[in-house]
Amino acid sequence: MGVTKKPDLTDPVLRAKLAKGMGHNYYGEPAWPNDLLYIFPVVILGTIACNVGLAVLEPSMIGEPADPFATPLEILPEWYFFPVFQILRTVPNKLLGVLLMVSVPAGLLTVPFLENVNKFQNPFRRPVATTVFLIGTVVALWLGIGATLPIEKSLTLGLF
C-alpha cells in the first residue's frame, strides 16, 4: 500500500508553479509498484510479441551463396565509409591518407580551445564552430558523393 503525498494548495510558491504548469504530479499513482510491476512487463512482452509476429509473418531470406569468382569491378563500402574511402582512393600516398583521416578528429578537438572565450550556445554567435561545422559537412558530402563516381570524375563530381 503506497502512501501518496497530498499537496498544500495554500502554499503560494506551489500555486505559482501550478499556474505556470511547472508542478509535480502529486495527484497520480506512485511509480512503484504500479508502473514497474504491471505496465513495464506489458510493454516488454508486447514488444517481444510484435517482433516474433513480424519474424513469423515476414521472415528474412538468407540470400544466395557467395561466389568468390563473380565479384564486381569496383567494390564500394557502406555509405557511411564513402568519405574515408574517397580520401584513401584519391590520395596517392597511403600514409598521407591515414594522416588526413587522423587530422579530422584532431582538428575537431581544437575547436573548443579556439572558441573558449565565447560562452554563447546560439550557433549564430559562435562563428568558428559554425564555420567548422558547415565546411566539414560540405567536405563530407563532397567526398561521399565523389566516392560513388568513377575515379576520373570523383574529385570534380563530373561538373567540370
UniProtKB/Swiss-Prot annotation:
<dbReference type="GO" id="GO:0045158">
    <property type="term" value="F:electron transporter, transferring electrons within cytochrome b6/f complex of photosystem II activity"/>
</dbReference>
<keyword id="KW-0813">Transport</keyword>
<feature type="transmembrane region" description="Helical">
    <location>
        <begin position="131"/>
        <end position="151"/>
    </location>
</feature>
<keyword id="KW-0934">Plastid</keyword>
<dbReference type="Pfam" id="PF00032">
    <property type="entry name" value="Cytochrom_B_C"/>
</dbReference>
<dbReference type="InterPro" id="IPR005798">
    <property type="entry name" value="Cyt_b/b6_C"/>
</dbReference>
<feature type="transmembrane region" description="Helical">
    <location>
        <begin position="95"/>
        <end position="115"/>
    </location>
</feature>
<dbReference type="InterPro" id="IPR005870">
    <property type="entry name" value="Cyt_b6/f_cplx_suIV"/>
</dbReference>
<dbReference type="GO" id="GO:0009767">
    <property type="term" value="P:photosynthetic electron transport chain"/>
</dbReference>
<keyword id="KW-0472">Membrane</keyword>
<comment type="subunit">
    <text>The 4 large subunits of the cytochrome b6-f complex are cytochrome b6, subunit IV (17 kDa polypeptide, petD), cytochrome f and the Rieske protein, while the 4 small subunits are petG, petL, petM and petN. The complex functions as a dimer.</text>
</comment>
<keyword id="KW-0812">Transmembrane</keyword>
<feature type="transmembrane region" description="Helical">
    <location>
        <begin position="36"/>
        <end position="56"/>
    </location>
</feature>
<dbReference type="InterPro" id="IPR048260">
    <property type="entry name" value="Cytochrome_b_C_euk/bac"/>
</dbReference>
<keyword id="KW-0249">Electron transport</keyword>
<keyword id="KW-0793">Thylakoid</keyword>
<keyword id="KW-0150">Chloroplast</keyword>
<keyword id="KW-0602">Photosynthesis</keyword>
<dbReference type="InterPro" id="IPR036150">
    <property type="entry name" value="Cyt_b/b6_C_sf"/>
</dbReference>
<protein>
    <recommendedName>
        <fullName>Cytochrome b6-f complex subunit 4</fullName>
    </recommendedName>
</protein>
<dbReference type="GO" id="GO:0045156">
    <property type="term" value="F:electron transporter, transferring electrons within the cyclic electron transport pathway of photosynthesis activity"/>
</dbReference>
<keyword id="KW-1133">Transmembrane helix</keyword>
<dbReference type="GO" id="GO:0016491">
    <property type="term" value="F:oxidoreductase activity"/>
</dbReference>
<comment type="similarity">
    <text>Belongs to the cytochrome b family. PetD subfamily.</text>
</comment>
<dbReference type="GO" id="GO:0009535">
    <property type="term" value="C:chloroplast thylakoid membrane"/>
</dbReference>
<comment type="function">
    <text>Component of the cytochrome b6-f complex, which mediates electron transfer between photosystem II (PSII) and photosystem I (PSI), cyclic electron flow around PSI, and state transitions.</text>
</comment>
